[in-house]
Swiss-Prot record:
Gene3D superfamilies recorded: 1.10.530.10, Periplasmic binding protein-like II (3.40.190.10)
Top EC class for this record: lyase
UniProt entry tagged with the keyword Cell wall biogenesis/degradation: yes
Signal peptide, first to last residue: 1-30
CDD domains assigned: MLTF-like, PBP2_YfhD_N
PROSITE patterns membership: TRANSGLYCOSYLASE
Name assigned to this protein: Membrane-bound lytic murein transglycosylase F
Renumbered residue ranges of the record's region Non-LT domain: 31-269
Documented EC number(s): 4.2.2.n1
Gene responsible for this protein: mltF
A single MF term (Gene Ontology): peptidoglycan lytic transglycosylase activity
Organism this protein belongs to: Salmonella paratyphi A (strain ATCC 9150 / SARB42)
Length: 514
């Protein structure tokens, strides 16, 4: 799979094209009989979506998601409230448009020539590919030539059906598939994971998220090239809603807020490591329970799961871990840092965790106030790894290379340059292993994603097991808990730091499975 791309250039080109087409409708606030006027008169923007980690999810009563945040900002832009309706599958989403029950569909839907004949697309803001997935250990198809309807099931309304039909007509005459009208893409992915289904097709971002909690889900092959993701609305003769969307996306693109939201949800790295993820989840089961009370005790300004992810990146939760440079313990503190924090034994789990948490808090306090609240933690982690002075150099280099020093997206791209002489020789604090700091932060984000999703699923499994045990007293919760749990939508935000986010940038595992 190609790396997911954020299409800022495409947005700019599309802006010019749509502006010409929509010019009679601008300024759209002055219209009296139009879609925007109807929305404002109603006082509500109606958006239909699908429950997924990337688009929209409710965790502990709070709402998250890339499309949700953008839709909320658009509602604010229009001066109205947002009403979100969650549907089971894509077909139901377009039914909402057809029946006049939704103004917009914001659900990670890809641009498709067949769709745009009947519905109005908005600006495109990132891209995905469609991929065939299977379970590790099962037969991996190398081509679609031998895939049939007894193996491959697709969710209703999935645009990939059009691609499959074209492939059947041009390359693979024996290709066949089944559409299950009662199941969405998430359910079908769960069935592949559980072994109930051989194959399904989903977008690369959704697959990347599933793999963080279920590393046994594997990519067999790409079915399509990269496809732009967009919102959809009804075809509108006066184009006022399209013009409003165009203005809105232009504004958030120019002020940097679109890039920040996409970094939050899509900026978590591009490599999936099956062995590493599986090892981490085993450690969550076998090692974390003993350390969890300490992480919860000392994580004051951040989510305890983030602190746990930092510790795993540092030491793999080994209190006796020691590096060649002399750093030691769960949080891998230097001797000088430990002394400055009043620690006497770096190999003592509680001392190490408390010291690491305080040191991270110190780094966060130093991050310039101009950095957005939800990105401060990433700057602090880079400073935690390579030193605050080198983080300042990275910001300075970002300015010199015409980037935004307050944008983590921009700054992290410059981190590897700190180890290259043409760059570090001109910086105040000189050489730094910036590439290691980059990998350090990205790995922590990945571990936190896995930890949050895995723990939330276990909690739900335990709750369901208790309910089933009450309904069927002959079966104990312990027996029910032995069954594999299904993937649920998972996001988490603690102390203002979002941990998910569907866009991660993922590629399928490199190791081929037989």
């Amino acid at each position: 799979m190609k790396k997911l791309k954020i299409n800022y250039l495409f947005i700019g080109i599309l802006t010019l094209l749509l502006a010409a087409a929509l010019w009679p409708s601008i300024p759209w606030f002055g219209k009296t009989e139009n879609h925007i006027a109807a929305i404002q008169a109603r006082g509500v923007l109606r958006v239909s979506t699908i429950d997924s980690p990337l688009t929209y999810s409710v965790i502990n009563g709070k709402k998250y998601g890339l499309d949700y945040e953008l839709a909320q900002q658009f509602a604010n832009y229009l001066g109205v409230k947002l009403k979100v309706t969650v549907r089971q599958n894509i077909s139901q989403l377009f039914d909402d448009l057809d029946n006049g029950n939704a103004d917009l569909l914001a659900a990670g839907l890809v641009y498709d020539s067949a769709r745009v004949k009947n519905y109005q697309p908005g600006p495109m803001y990132y891209s995905v590919s469609q991929q065939l997935v299977y379970r590790v250990g099962q037969y991996r198809p190398r081509s679609l030539a031998t895939v049939n309807e007894n193996q491959l099931t697709i969710a209703p309304g999935h645009v990939v059906v059009n691609d499959l039909q074209r492939l059947k007509e041009t390359k693979f005459p024996d290709l066949s598939w089944k559409v299950d009208d009662k199941k969405g893409s998430t359910t079908l992915l769960e069935e592949v994971i559980s072994g109930k289904l051989d194959y399904t097709i989903a977008d690369s971002v959704a697959i990347g998220l599933f793999q963080r909690v279920h590393p046994e889900l594997a990519v067999a092959l790409d079915v399509t090239d990269e496809q732009p993701v967009t919102w959809f609305s009804r075809l509108d003769d006066n184009n006022t809603l399209s013009a409003a969307l165009l203005d809105f996306f232009n504004s958030i693109n120019e002020d940097g807020s679109l890039a920040r939201i996409e970094e939050k949800y899509l900026g978590h790295g591009d490599d999936f490591d099956y062995v590493d993820t599986r090892s981490f989840l085993r450690a969550v089961d076998n090692v974390l329970p003993e350390l969890e009370p300490l992480f919860k005790k000392y994580a004051k300004e951040i989510d305890w799961r983030l602190l746990a992810a930092i510790s795993y990146q540092e030491s793999h939760w080994d209190p006796l871990a020691t590096s060649p440079t002399g750093v030691r313990g769960l949080m891998m503190l230097t001797k000088n840092t430990a002394q400055s924090l009043g620690l006497t034994d770096r190999t003592d789990a509680e001392q190490s965790i408390s010291g690491g948490a305080r040191y991270l808090e110190d780094m966060m306090a130093k991050v310039p106030e101009t950095v957005p609240e939800d990105e401060r933690i990433w700057f602090a982690l880079a400073a935690y790894n390579m030193g605050y002075a080198h983080m300042l150099d990275a910001r300075s280099l970002t300015v010199k290379t015409k980037g935004n020093p307050d944008s983590w997206t921009d700054v992290k791209q410059r981190l590897p340059l700190l180890s290259q002489k043409p760059y570090y020789s001109k910086l105040t604090y000189g050489y730094a292993r910036g590439h290691e700091a980059y990998a350090y932060v990205e790995n922590i984000r990945k571990y936190q994603i896995s930890l949050v999703g895995y723990l939330q699923e276990k909690e739900k499994q335990e709750a369901e097991a208790m309910k089933l045990a009450q309904d069927y007293p002959a079966v104990s919760p312990e027996e029910l808990n032995k069954a594999p749990f299904p993937l649920l939508s998972f996001l988490s935000q603690s102390s203002g730091y979002l941990t998910h986010s569907p866009s991660l940038l993922f590629t399928p595992q490199k190791k081929e499975e037989k």
